[in-house]
């Protein structure tokens, strides 16, 4: 008996159910939209461009041509602890971020690339406030933002070949504390959630 949804007619359901059961939880420190993805498997109406900064930012990127499609080519999902650790080590191995001067534009490009290629919703790369070292809020992300010594900033800005638009030449204009920051890999961040210890108030709803 049974109609269209009888157990025997739903081919592949046991595999889907098992995949859902084994889905990893979202990492501590991800944003509200990623929590929706974890809990409901989709972004709900409680997180829209009108009330969620990450959703609004993503919508703006879709309207602007950024050089590659911003619709993910894989299923949308929240950043997990394991994925954050794996991504950190992948970027370290490829020489991607270590010592690179941080700017909001560079962070946006990285977030979009990860969203497009891996499907991780771009609300996970957030840091503790300054001044000083900024620690990642997402547990498992092993890159912190470290202030560059002022003499190194001055040295980098000497000469005629300096680009005024290079992040090091902007003297921290992106940063509320006006510090020039660089991404720095720290493997201990995979085991020690520094941000949670320094700012427990950010994790009340996690």
Swiss-Prot record:
A motif (PxxP) lies at residues 72-75. A motif (Diacidic) lies at residues 174-175. A lipid is attached at residue 2 (N-myristoyl glycine). Keywords: AIDS, Apoptosis, Early protein, Host cell membrane, Host Golgi apparatus, Host membrane, Host-virus interaction, Inhibition of host adaptive immune response by virus, Inhibition of host autophagy by virus, Inhibition of host MHC class I molecule presentation by virus, Inhibition of host MHC class II molecule presentation by virus, Lipoprotein, Membrane, Myristate, Phosphoprotein, Secreted, SH3-binding, Viral immunoevasion, Virion, Virulence. One of its GO terms (biological process) is negative regulation of glycoprotein biosynthetic process. GO terms for molecular function: ATPase binding; CD4 receptor binding; GTP binding; MHC class I protein binding; protein kinase binding; SH3 domain binding; signaling receptor binding; thioesterase binding. Its main location: host cell. Residues 108-124 are annotated as: Mediates dimerization, Nef-PTE1 interaction. The record marks 57-58 as: Cleavage. The keyword Translocase does not apply. It is found in: Host cell membrane; Virion; Secreted; Host Golgi apparatus membrane. Monomer; cytosolic form. Homodimer; membrane bound form. Interacts with Nef associated p21-activated kinase (PAK2); this interaction activates PAK2. Associates with the Nef-MHC-I-AP1 complex; this complex is required for MHC-I internalization. Interacts (via C-terminus) with host PI3-kinase. Interacts with host PACS1; this interaction seems to be weak. Interacts with host PACS2. Interacts with host LCK and MAPK3; these interactions inhibit the kinase activity of the latter. Interacts with host ATP6V1H; this interaction may play a role in CD4 endocytosis. This is Protein Nef. It comes from Human immunodeficiency virus type 1 group M subtype B (isolate BH10).
């Amino acid at each position: 008996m049974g109609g269209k949804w009888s157990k025997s007619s739903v081919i592949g359901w046991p595999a889907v159910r098992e995949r859902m059961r084994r889905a990893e939880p979202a990492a501590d420190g991800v944003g509200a939209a990623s929590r929706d993805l974890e809990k409901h498997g989709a972004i709900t109406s409680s997180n829209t461009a009108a009330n969620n900064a990450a959703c609004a930012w993503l919508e703006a990127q879709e309207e602007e041509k950024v050089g590659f499609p911003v619709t993910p080519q894989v299923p949308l999902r929240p950043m997990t602890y394991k994925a954050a650790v794996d991504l950190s080590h992948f970027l370290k191995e490829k020489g991607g971020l270590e010592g690179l001067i941080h700017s909001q534009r560079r962070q946006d490009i990285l977030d979009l690339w990860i969203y497009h290629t891996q499907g991780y919703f771009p609300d996970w790369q957030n840091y503790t406030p300054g001044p000083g070292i900024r620690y990642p809020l997402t547990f498992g992300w092993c890159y912190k933002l470290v202030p560059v010594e002022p003499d190194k900033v001055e040295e980098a800005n000497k000469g005629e070949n300096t680009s005024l638009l290079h992040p090091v030449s902007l003297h921290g204009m992106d940063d509320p504390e006006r510090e020039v920051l660089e991404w720095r890999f720290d493997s201990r961040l995979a085991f020690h959630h520094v941000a949670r210890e320094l700012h427990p108030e950010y994790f009340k709803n996690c």
